């Protein structure tokens, strides 16, 4: 019986701000985490990701390359960020030229098990649990559904 190739990430080449909490196990590598952030267990944050100050990333979330998240955000449990839009009809298979960036501005809350495709989301947005964000969000408000649509403004 063959042995698999094993890769261990853990916490490698991460730039941490002040007063950051990481609950292990977590895979963080080549990313930047701002001041006063919280990273829950079973989170993966890949290289070149930037997390702004006072942002919370809850357990079982996946933040792939080419994602930036602003200040004072909440990423609830099980949120998935996607950087490969399958623009060629299938997976890019590591061809970074086919990947696209995701930009999350400040004060954005993303509900549990939401999926965020390569988009930009403006400040002061709430994304409902289980939502699938397929297009840029340019107006503050509450968004939910698949695909995510604006339900109402913020009060």
Task: Describe each PLM feature range.
Residues 1-16, 22-121, 146-147, 151-155:
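Flexible, glycine/small-residue-enriched loop-and-beta-strand segment within the central core
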């Amino acid at each position: 019986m063959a042995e698999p190739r094993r890769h261990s990430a853990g916490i490698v080449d991460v730039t941490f701000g002040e007063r950051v909490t990481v609950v292990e196990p977590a895979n963080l590598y080549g990313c930047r985490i701002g001041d006063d952030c919280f990273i829950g267990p079973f989170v993966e944050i890949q290289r070149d990701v930037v997390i702004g100050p006072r942002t919370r990333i809850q357990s079982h979330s996946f933040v792939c390359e080419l994602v930036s998240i602003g200040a004072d955000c909440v990423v609830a449990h099980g949120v998935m960020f996607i950087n490969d839009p399958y623009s060629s009809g299938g997976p890019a298979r590591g061809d970074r030229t086919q990947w696209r960036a995701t930009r999350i501005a400040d004060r954005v809350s993303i509900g549990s098990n939401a999926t965020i495709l390569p988009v930009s989301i403006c400040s002061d947005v709430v994304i409902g649990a289980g939502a699938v964000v397929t297009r840029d969000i340019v107006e503050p408000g509450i968004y939910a559904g698949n695909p995510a649509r604006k339900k109402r403004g913020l009060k």
